[in-house]
């Protein structure tokens, strides 16, 4: 969800609750107000995965709200994202650009697991739940500037498929 509000929205909240109960993974943009305001809604919800923005090296983007203590503060590429607008190449920044990057990263992990891992039904179900994917993102993250920089390279770079399969299985064994 590449949007956010300061106030509650009953319809959006109801949709999030329904999706969460159906074990759908939900990602929400943190906010672009920097340290001036907290996370927006729905990113404040404990039923979504809140996403902050960073540059391609994991450096904070300046637009994300301050990281919350004792909370996961995932950040993905959301600064100077190459885009097309009115037939021209432009570079856009914001947590609303970081959020689909996080969703795509999650989709890549899930597809890899579906095709390469010999998962039990229980493990597959756990991987597709918020808590399971949070564990995967934590395994792919490093602390940087108070944020949890999600870098798929931490899981894949220089590793064989067997190594990645083992990493995913180890994560699932801890759930």
Region annotations inferred by a language model:
Residues 1-11, 117-118:
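Short acidic, glycine-rich surface-loop motifs adjacent to enzyme active sites
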Residues 8-29, 37, 41, 47:
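Catalytic-core regions built around general acid/base machinery
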Residues 1-2, 27-31, 51-52:
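Active-site neighborhood of phospho(di)ester-bond hydrolases with catalytic His/Asp-centered motifs
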Residues 145-175:
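C-terminal domain-closing interface element
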Residues 24, 38-114:
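Extracellular S/T/G-rich loop segment that most often corresponds to the catalytic His/Ser-adjacent loop
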Residues 5-8, 31-35, 55-57:
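Short beta->alpha connector loops
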Residues 79-155:
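Hydrolase catalytic cores
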Residues 5-6, 18-21, 111, 136:
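Low-complexity, intrinsically disordered flanking regions
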